Amino acid sequence: MKNYLFYVGIDISKLKLDVVLIENVATNKSEHFIVENTSKGIKSIISQLKKKKIDLNKTLFCFENTGVYTYPLSINLSEFELDYWIVPAIEIKRSKGISRGKNDKTDAKDIAWYSVRNIDKLKLSSIAEKEIQQLKLLFTEREKVMKTLLVFGTTKENKDFITNDVFKVVSTINAKTIKSLKISLKELETKMKEIIKNNSELKQQFDLIRSVPGVGQQSAMYFIIATKGFKAFDNSRKFACYSGTAPFEYSSGSSVRGGTKVNHMADKKMKSLLQMGALAAIKHDPQLKEYYNKKKNEGKKSMLVLNNIRCKIIDRVFSVINRKTPYINTYKFAS
């Protein structure tokens, strides 16, 4: 592990970045300055650090994952080939212990301190490839359109409770809006398929994932997005934890013996897609169907068995990616 001499904590907001610099040999001293959350502002951070004669190759930048507001900083630090660490906000919050009040300067300092104290947990971050960034944005827009379609679709429920003259006022406008949204939805899905098709590596991954029973087109795309093209996770167990399907023990001393259960801190979209995939798999995959029925007959709860199937789907997906060969159902060859 690299021995860093300087730690930079950055609190990100929409318009500005609060930057706090801590030196490894004098952690009781810190410097604070503010820049705009733009490419120009981020480059000024680099300039100010250089003016202070700071070795950027021995500097670790640390900041919270704030979604789209994080992109400019991640992109610029990647271009300068500098080390940075993106940490979940809840992890930093819980590491602070009891605290009273907050402001951006204090938050930036807490982030810098987190990187100093938890250097043994360091896992350097990297920006996803351009195609995966595009897929993520398109997938998010598709989700918005799907939710909007659902909202506008409920308007027809009013038809049975009001007169035709009254309903006609909104029905025509509603129909035009729904038609427009469906066109937008089709365009988004077409563009996503086009991006997959034009990238040989993503196309191969997509086809391999689709070969697994229970995994549809949208699930396959989200697997690629969530794993950053299967570069963000080393194995299926880590991804199962990320997806909220890995079981954990809950016990303490001799009296607390909670059941083994999953944790709610997870990618809820991935978990939802896996749930739908598990329900489809027990209908169309004879092996998983038999497994589900067997466990149910043993008295296991439905959700427990379905969660096991979600984990099996993840294992299968990672297996086909690692082998680079499609999933083959050997169950039908068993005697």
Which stretches of residues belong to each language-model region?
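Gly/Thr-rich phosphate-binding beta-strand-loop-beta motif of the actin/hexokinase/Hsp70
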Residues: 2-23, 111
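Nucleic-acid-processing active sites and adjacent nucleic-acid-binding tracks
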Residues: 26-60
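Short, solvent-exposed helix-loop connector elements
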Residues: 52, 123-137, 163-166, 258-261, ...
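Acidic, metal-coordinating catalytic cores used for nucleic-acid/nucleotide bond scission
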Residues: 62-72
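Long, charge-rich intrinsically disordered scaffolds of nucleic-acid metabolism proteins
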Residues: 75, 85, 89-208
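Phosphate-backbone recognition surface of nucleic-acid-processing proteins
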Residues: 207, 211, 217, 221-298, ...
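Low-complexity, acidic/Ser/Thr- and charged residue-rich accessory regions of DNA metabolism proteins
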Residues: 254-255, 292-335
